[in-house]
C-alpha cells in the first residue's frame, strides 16, 4: 500500500493544528477502504482563502469547512492522484465548538468527508447522503471517535 499526502499549511498561525501524521492517518483510514494506492494534497487555509475559493467554485460568498477538487486525468493516463482538499482552520474550530465535538474528531471528520468526495461520493440527493453519512460514521468510529452525526440523530 502506498499513500502519499502533500500537506500545506497556509495559515497565519499553525499553533494547535494537527500534525502531518494525524492528517496521514485520517486520510488513510478513508481511502484504504477503496484503493491501496492514493495521493492527495491537503491545504489548511484561513477564512479569506476559503471564502475566495468557495465564491469562485461554488458561488457562495462565505468560508466553508472543506472544499474538494478531484483530479481528472487526461484520457489514457492513470495516476493515483485523487485531488486536493482545502480545509478552513477557523470554520473547523468554530464548528467543533458549536457542535460540542473534540477538535481532533472534527478535523478527522473533515478529512474523511473530503476524501470521500474525491472518491466520487456526494450528499446532494438523500440516498447518496445516507450512504456517505454511513461511510463517514463507520470510518470515524473505527478511528475511535464518536459518530459525527450523533447530535442530528437525537
Curated annotation (Swiss-Prot):
GO terms for cellular component: cytoplasm. InterPro entries: MetalPrtase_cat_dom_sf_prd, YbeY, YbeY_CS. Keywords: Cytoplasm, Endonuclease, Hydrolase, Metal-binding, Nuclease, Ribosome biogenesis, rRNA processing, Zinc. One of its GO terms (biological process) is rRNA processing. It is an enzyme of class 3 (hydrolase). Its EC number is 3.1.-.-. SUPFAM superfamilies: Metalloproteases ('zincins'), catalytic domain. It is found in: Cytoplasm. Its cofactor is Zn(2+). Gene3D superfamilies: Metalloproteases ('zincins'), catalytic domain. It comes from the Bacteria. Single strand-specific metallo-endoribonuclease involved in late-stage 70S ribosome quality control and in maturation of the 3' terminus of the 16S rRNA. This is Endoribonuclease YbeY. It comes from Photobacterium profundum (strain SS9).
Amino acid at each position: 500500500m502506498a499513500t502519499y499526502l502533500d500537506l500545506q499549511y497556509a495559515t497565519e498561525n499553525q499553533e494547535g493544528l494537527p500534525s502531518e501524521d494525524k492528517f496521514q492517518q485520517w486520510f488513510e483510514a478513508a481511502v484504504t477502504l477503496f484503493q491501496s494506492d492514493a495521493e492527495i494534497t491537503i491545504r489548511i487555509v484561513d477564512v479569506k482563502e476559503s471564502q475566495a475559493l468557495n465564491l469562485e467554485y461554488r458561488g457562495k460568498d462565505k468560508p466553508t469547512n472543506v472544499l474538494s477538487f478531484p483530479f481528472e486525468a487526461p484520457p489514457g493516463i492513470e495516476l493515483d492522484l485523487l485531488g486536493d482538499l482545502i480545509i478552513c482552520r477557523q470554520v473547523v474550530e468554530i464548528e467543533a465548538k458549536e457542535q460540542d465535538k473534540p477538535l481532533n474528531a472534527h478535523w478527522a471528520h473533515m478529512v474523511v468527508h473530503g476524501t470521500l468526495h474525491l472518491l466520487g461520493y456526494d450528499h446532494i440527493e438523500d440516498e447518496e447522503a445516507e450512504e456517505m453519512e454511513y461511510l463517514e460514521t463507520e470510518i470515524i468510529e473505527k478511528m475511535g471517535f464518536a459518530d459525527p452525526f450523533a447530535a442530528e440523530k437525537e
